Amino acid sequence: MANVSIHGPTGVLVVDGQKVFPIGLSDPPPHDGQAPSGEHAFRELANGGATMIRTGTPNWALGRINQQIAKEKTIQDSAAAHGLQCWMRLGPAADLPGAAANAQILQKVVTAFKDHPALCAYKGIDEPRNPFRGAKWIRPAGLVRAHTRIKALDPKHPLVIIQAPRGPVSQLVPYRPAFDITGVDIFPIAYPPGLHSDNGNPDISVVGDMAYKMDEASGGKPFWMTLQIAWSGVAPSKAAPDLVPRFPTLKQERFMAYQAIVHGARGLIFFGGHLTEVCTPDDAKAGWNWTFWRQVLRPVVHELTSSQLRPALLVPNAKILVRTKPHSEVELAVRRAGKFLYVIAVKRGGSTLLVELLGLPKRQNGAPLTKGEVLFEYVQRPLPPPPRPDRQVPRPIKVSGGGFRDWFSPYDVHVYRFDLS
């Protein structure tokens, strides 16, 4: 059994005593599938940095509960064997009293998996306050009762409720007692853009807007952001035959992930790899969008889980006021981990600017900072010519008077690291 709790100062998960910034895939490849590399599908994801997958079913039914539990156990066994954990859907059963069988289903499912080594967290009813539910939106009271019951059955795994990117914060506040972690789905890329949310921002920077909204709605509890691989708004169907497939580029996905982190997200979920109707023929046969994983998602996840950056995702925001001059659309998060200070900077949009960042502290010995580095951006030192392939280092930054200048184009991400020792 994995003992999973929430780290109070940060909101990240603590899994068997180790802090984890969860990176999940919803839904994953088939549990018995194979990646194009030849690896087991789940092992490929774990090796690439993913920590968990969404599992479970949205329609647990008492009449076939034993078969459903057996199927879920096979998936969780495979996840555990290949280095992944599971975020298990409870579906409508996580609403009490709800349907007559809900309480029985909830007890059977939670009891069946609460001691499974792959279980990471439970997923409550999806988007309970989505305006598209109309008058049938899910009232908080039943979800609060379900949360209480789940915690009585299994106090060692959190319950997560993800909301829709629509409606005011005031509609989400009543759900606070119903979850341990909340979050939001936000899929801004489509033709035309901006269809998924209702806040009027058609740009990919709507991710930051939604993160800000969930930070307010959460009441101090942690939140995750569910970001786009694909979604129903880019997948043609009989009901919407004229939709045109569209996916985030590497730059867009990287920006959305880092902007979510800058605005406080303590976990990221990537949705839509299982929508085979918009995959290549080979990926459709394999049951998952391995092309997107290879070209876009794996490079982003590799950065987030790297030894250079990972420590910064597991600590609170530092109480250091780093600011930009002139005022720009650059958004910042400042973290202190060990001897390093991290400044994660993203540019929402606008024009290309040379931006000054000010407010860096002195080193631990009182001496001023004179240099830093930009992670994941590489240059040769000493400078060429001649080219020396064995001399690539992170791009250096010169610091003077507690500040430095750097270029930002729209949707740029720069991850700065400074050695304070």
For the regions a protein language model found, what residue spans apply to each?
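Carbohydrate-binding surface patches
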Residues: 324-364, 411-414
